[in-house]
Amino acid sequence: MLNNAMSVVILAAGKGTRMYSDLPKVLHTLAGKAMVQHVIDAANELGAAHVHLVYGHGGDLLKQALKDDNLNWVLQAEQLGTGHAMQQAAPFFADDEDILMLYGDVPLISVETLQRLRDAKPQGGIGLLTVKLDDPTGYGRITRENGKVTGIVEHKDATDELRQIQEINTGILIANGADMKRWLAKLTNNNAQGEYYITDIIALAYQEGREIVAVHPQRLSEVEGVNNRLQLSRLERVYQSEQAEKLLLAGVMLRDPARFDLRGTLTHGRDVEIDTNVIIEGNVTLGHRVKIGTGCVIKNSVIGDDCEISPYTVVEDANLAAACTIGPFARLRPGAELLEGAHVGNFVEMKKARLGKGSKAGHLTYLGDAEIGDNVNIGAGTITCNYDGANKFKTIIGDDVFVGSDTQLVAPVTVGKGATIAAGTTVTRNVGENALAISRVPQTQKEGWRRPVKKK
C-alpha cells in the first residue's frame, strides 16, 4: 500500500540508573553499536522524513556520539512520562504526516516489523505493536471489546481482573500527526505514577470512534527493552545467534556459532571457514575459501581469495590480495596492504606499509610507513625506524631484496632492487641495486675473558 510521509520520534531521555554507569543508557553498545544507533538506523531505513530524538540525561554525550545530520534534538528537561516526552516533540509534527514512536533502549526492532505496522495503520486511526506474554507482570494491558482494541491500562493502575490479560503494550505505535497533537494535548497525569502516559491516547482515539489495529512482531526479542546490563547481555546473545544462523545458512562454516561475534557487516564468498572466538567489526569482506583461526579480530578490512589468517591475529583497516598468509599473533594496523602471496608471520606488525607479491616478513618485525617490493625477504627482528619524535618518514625497499635479521632501516631511506642487507646492519643511507650493505664492526675475541663478579 501507499504510505503517507512519516517522521519518527525516538525516546532516549532516561537516565538508566540500573546500568550503574556514567554513560547514558542508550549509548551502551549492542554488537559494537550504541543501542539508540540501531533504532536510528531502522528509522532511516524506513525512509523517515525526520527523526526527532527526545533526550534528557547525558545530552552532551549523546550529541558527541551521534553524528546523524537527520536528527532533530528535542530536550525533555523533566522526565514526566512517555506522553510528556511526546509533547516535547509535538511542535515539530506536520499535520499530514504519520508519526512513529520508538525507544532508544529497544535496539532489535526490525524494519520489517515496523513496515508491517506502518502498512496496517488505519486511516485516521492508530497502529499499535503488541505481544502476548505468559507472565505480563509490570506491563500495560491491552483492553478489548468485541475483539477491538479500546485502551491500555498500566500494570500499577490495573485491577486484578485486568492483570489476567496476557496481551501487553510494547510502547511502539504510529498515528497521524494532527491526531497525535490533539490527543497529546488532552493527556492528564491522574494515575498512580503521576505521569503523562502516551498509552492514554488509545482510549482517546477509541472514544472518537477511531480504529486501533494491533500488530505483532516477528520475534519477541524485537520489542525487549534494556534496563540493566544483564538484559543487554541477553539481547547481545540473541542478536549474535541470529547473525550466526544467517551466515551458516549462507554457507559460512562457523566452527562454534555460540563463540562468534559480528559487530558490523560481513560480505563473504564461498567456503569461508571461521574458527572460534573470532570478532568481525565494521565492514569486512572475505573472499572465497578464506580461513580465519581462533581468537582473531578483523575490522574494516578486505581479505582476498584463499587467504589464511592464523590464530590470535588482529587486522584493522587493511587490504589483503589473494593467497596471503598471516600470523599467528600478527598485527596489521590501518594502511597495511599485502599483495598476492605475501606472508606476515608471528609477532610482525605493519602500519601504513605495503608488502609486495610473494614477499615475506616471518617473525618479530615492525614495518611502518614502508613500501616493500616483490619477492623480498624481511629477516627476523627487522625494524623500519620511521619516527624521529616529531615526524614520520618512509622506507622504500625494491624487488628481490634480502634483509638480514636484526636490521634497522632508519628512514627516510631507499634500498635498491636486488640488494642484500647483512644481519645486524643499521641502514642510514640509501643502498644501490644489487649492493651488499653491512655496518657491523669487526668481531674481536679476547681469550680467557673473565666476567665481572658481584661483590658480596
Swiss-Prot record:
In the N-terminal section; belongs to the N-acetylglucosamine-1-phosphate uridyltransferase family. In the C-terminal section; belongs to the transferase hexapeptide repeat family. GO terms for molecular function: glucosamine-1-phosphate N-acetyltransferase activity; magnesium ion binding; UDP-N-acetylglucosamine diphosphorylase activity. Mg(2+) binds at D105, N227. HAMAP family: GlmU. Its main location: cytoplasm. Its EC number is 2.7.7.23, 2.3.1.157. Acetyl-CoA binds at A380, N386, Y387, S405, A423, R440. It is found in: Cytoplasm. It comes from Escherichia coli (strain 55989 / EAEC). GO terms for biological process: cell morphogenesis; cell wall organization; lipid A biosynthetic process; peptidoglycan biosynthetic process; regulation of cell shape; UDP-N-acetylglucosamine biosynthetic process. Catalyzes the last two sequential reactions in the de novo biosynthetic pathway for UDP-N-acetylglucosamine (UDP-GlcNAc). The C-terminal domain catalyzes the transfer of acetyl group from acetyl coenzyme A to glucosamine-1-phosphate (GlcN-1-P) to produce N-acetylglucosamine-1-phosphate (GlcNAc-1-P), which is converted into UDP-GlcNAc by the transfer of uridine 5-monophosphate (from uridine 5-triphosphate), a reaction catalyzed by the N-terminal domain. Gene3D superfamilies: Hexapeptide repeat proteins, Spore Coat Polysaccharide Biosynthesis Protein SpsA, Chain A. Homotrimer. This is Bifunctional protein GlmU.
